[in-house]
Amino acid sequence: MKNDVIIIGAGIGGMNAGMQLASQGYSVTILEKRSEPGGKMRRVFHGDCLFDAGPSLITMPFILRDAFAQTGAVLDEYLKLLPIDPICHYRWLDGKQYDCHANPLNRNEETEKVFGRKSMQEMNAYLAHASKVYHATKDVFLFNPFDGFKEFFKRKNLPLLPALPSLKFSSKFHTFNADYFTNPKLIQLFDRFSTYNGSSPYLAPATLMVIPFIEFEYGGWYPEGGIYAIAEAFHKRCLELGVNFIFNADVDEIITDKKTAKGVKTKDGNMYEAKHVISNADVYHAKHDLLKKAHTKKPELSTSGFVMLIPMHKNPFEMSHHTVLFSDAYEREFTTIFKDKESPEEMTVYISVSGKSDPSQVTNDKENWFVLVNTPPTSQANEWSDEKTARYKHSILTMIERFLPDMQSYIADEPFIITPDDFSMEFHATGGSLYGSSSNSMFSAFLRPTNTDPHIQNLHHCGGSAHPGGGIPLVILSGQFAAQSVMAHS
């Protein structure tokens, strides 16, 4: 049977596109390379612990609720979201610690206590500026498809033009942060938000100020049962609406005729015809490998990551759900990643211990430490040898022990390691990049691949490498926009 729509990849973007279309009567089949849905949102059981081995934080929960509501469902019947407070705990090597709260009263109190009244006032002024930018731009850049520079000149977007100077396109994110804050630790804390889409604060535009505003405004959330419960909820709703899933189906080619998508072929030789194809794959992979366009220009890629899933015995460290351990060499860290194309030896470390919020994730009095360090994307296959992996594991553990002395003595089982090579091979992510292209230019927001392919009719894109970008809420929106693109061209 010929499908109305074939979707490549059962990530969150692909599944949202599938359930939106199925709810409107389209016949949809999703082909997934792996044996389960979720894409990078996956779960690993290791050493008496469950780990979310991909995304670890939800912001803008209303996007999740809206996605289900648009199909006639109520999210609360599929998923229970828990607020995380503090959103994140920050530590520096000199012993300074700071809890970031979504509640403005608690945040003001903590900021004044740790950094002083002036810093509290600076933060409030910063967030007020970012709020204006977010509300001026959200309907153009986030909540609708975006088709490049020409979007500015559409009648509906003309009210944005007077606000353009406040967007600070020509300013670097770090420069903007340094103009607002006098305390270098707060500059570093806000600089870190550029890593939410895999970019450098020293290269990315100041428009990224909306990222901390969104987190502070809407809070941090976690679904009971782990982040993977989100993938399970989307999968369940898709099945209820009649979406067909075929797992262990690695798509090898998007079939075209006269520059029109006609279906796909998998590596085992099976052909699937469709009126429309949605690619939830990395956009560069889709163009270079699936469309066989050998001369596709590779974008500047976002960061990849080195992940360790560490089962820990009970310990005295009193970890929060989310913790960031800052290095003292932040600018050098990003120079090493983006200019030298090397993994930094003195690195900032992110640790998520979801068992702190959800005891169901651990057994036998263990703690589940998800440890992530930013790395450059790979430039060739099999770049992470066993020797290189072991050496970097040692470097990261040594760095953690500068904050948490003797931490390694509490490790209960050998860490489960995920390298940039693994991200590349498992998910066809170019160079193991976690977010597709970086935002390391003033025009990066306008150059992100569009949801409607500009060259191949009836081909559409969603996922973290397409508009509007990476992170759970934006990927959900990308699936919605891809579905809208199908409906607009049907």
Role assignments for model-derived ranges:
Residues 2-138:
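N-terminal glycine-rich phosphate/pyrophosphate-binding loop and immediately adjacent elements
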Residues 55, 464-486:
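A conserved FAD-binding loop/helix module that cradles the flavin
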Residues 93-204:
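Rossmann-like flavin
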Residues 164-173, 216-236, 384-392:
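Short beta-strand to alpha-helix junction loop
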Residues 183-197, 346-350, 406-468:
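A glycine-rich dinucleotide-binding beta-alpha-beta segment and adjacent secondary-structure elements
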Residues 210-261:
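Helical element adjacent to the flavin cofactor pocket in flavoenzyme catalytic cores
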Residues 222, 252-363:
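Mid-domain catalytic core of redox enzymes
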Residues 314-418:
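C-terminal segments that line or cap access tunnels to active or ligand-binding sites in enzymes
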